[in-house]
Amino acid sequence: MTRTQYGSLRAGGLNWDSMPLKLFAGGNAKFWDPAGIDFSRDRADWESLTERERDYATRLCAQFIAGEESVTQDIQPFMSAMRAEGRLGDEMYLTQFAFEEAKHTQVFRLWLDAVGVSEDLHGYLDDLPAYREIFFDRLPDALGMLAADPSPAAQVRASVTYNHVVEGMLALTGYFAWHKICVDRGILPGMQELVHRIGDDERRHMAWGTFTCRRHVAADDANWSVFEARMNELIPIALRLTEEGFELYGDDTPFGLSLDEFMQYSADKGMRRFGTISSARGRPLAEIDLDYSPLQLEDTFAAEDRQALAATA
């Protein structure tokens, strides 16, 4: 691709109020260093857990760290798609996005090292076929497709896969599990801080995905059908992954976690995204760039979680 001009040199400069650059500024303001989290108490808490509890927590962590590594690698074609559209603000934000995913991979590995988990963990994914379908096939395929086809429809399919299902359902449900494990028992303070830091980053990631889908739906209503179809295709797989994780432990799930509660939680997070995207239908495209409702949705989810967890404490 031949470079012909610079977005940062255009008359008027960059629109710092646009959604992508608001997210970029937010990430800069909330920078954190994985090496700065204190995991010193987590080792003793880890050793106090039963073998079955450690097995569950290790499997949960394996899913997270493999997922973070996956998205660190798979996000690259989205940057190229933004460049092809001439959207420098989005491209700037996605460089930060990729950096944050790499930090998330780092911090989960640091935690595993701190609690003494050093064996090969691939086996923890073998009993989760829905996980393998999403992370081994659906995610890399959808994002990899952008290298050859950066069209709006392909971007919507990729964003649904990554931002709305992987992050917006699976990751949020996983954070909910960590909160139930750690906060209810007052254990693993390092993991608690880790989840807080990552969750803050990923609220911005999910908001960008929602913004991107809204932008394309506002520009062409046909993209609403693309969004609907992809969500309806992937939500059942995401819910099946939650079921598979519980089925491995029978009727005695460690930490007293409830399948029904987690299925309801995950489904709620998926279904409520439809309304935010559909609200962009027929909207003037110029309004979408300055509409911060995608970030407000993620903040609402976070506030609801804090309230629910406080009620059970």
Curated annotation (Swiss-Prot):
This is R2-like ligand binding oxidase. Pfam families: Ribonuc_red_sm (PF00268). The keyword Repressor does not apply. Fe cation binds at E101, E167, E202, H205. It comes from Mycobacteroides abscessus (strain ATCC 19977 / DSM 44196 / CCUG 20993 / CIP 104536 / JCM 13569 / NCTC 13031 / TMC 1543 / L948) (Mycobacterium abscessus). It comes from the Bacteria. It is an enzyme of class 1 (oxidoreductase). InterPro entries: Ferritin-like_SF, R2LOX, RNR-like, RNR_small_fam. There is a cross-link at V71-Y162 (3-(O4'-tyrosyl)-valine (Val-Tyr)). Keywords: Iron, Manganese, Metal-binding, Oxidoreductase. Mn(2+) binds at E68, E101, H104. Its cofactor is Fe cation; Mn(2+). Belongs to the ribonucleoside diphosphate reductase small chain family. R2-like ligand binding oxidase subfamily. One of its GO terms (biological process) is deoxyribonucleotide biosynthetic process.
